[in-house]
A protein has these predicted regions:
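PLP-dependent amino-acid enzyme catalytic core
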Residues: 1-128
């Protein structure tokens, strides 16, 4: 699959009719199957928008570095898109995050900077 094809797949996910919810409400209700995105998350869309917007506005150029603090799917979405566009990715991630999540990020080429977990209001959340 070409890089262009992968990019085009982001957000191009099917709608699935939710039968029981539709029957209960007497209207058609659909769910968007975002797990069909390349990174298997709705966050692929956000990552694509952020990176393409940064390119368009000349905030980043080929070979640039993206740094993101995340414990979740945003990092995986950024990993998918950054790899395609040729950017390096550094993810600041809590040490407590699952091994599987860390392995997925590394497989996408991300460098992980592991930090102690801290609440968002704690200044330690922003420093190593």
């Amino acid at each position: 699959m070409s890089n262009d094809t992968v990019i085009k797949q982001i957000g191009n996910t099917p709608l699935i009719k939710l039968k029981q919810a539709s029957e209960l409400t007497q209207c058609n209700i659909f769910g968007k199957a975002e797990y069909f995105n390349p990174g298997e998350s709705v966050k692929d869309r956000a990552a694509l928008f952020i990176i393409e917007n940064a390119i368009k506005n000349k905030k980043i150029k080929k070979g640039g570095i993206i740094v993101e603090g995340t414990a979740g799917n945003t990092g995986i979405g950024l990993g998918v898109v950054a790899k395609i566009y040729g950017f390096s990715l550094k993810i600041v991630i809590p040490k407590t995050q699952s091994i599987e999540k860390k392995q997925a990020l590394k497989a996408l080429g991300a460098e992980l900077i592991e930090v102690d977990a801290a609440p968002y209001i704690d200044p330690k959340n922003y420093i190593k």
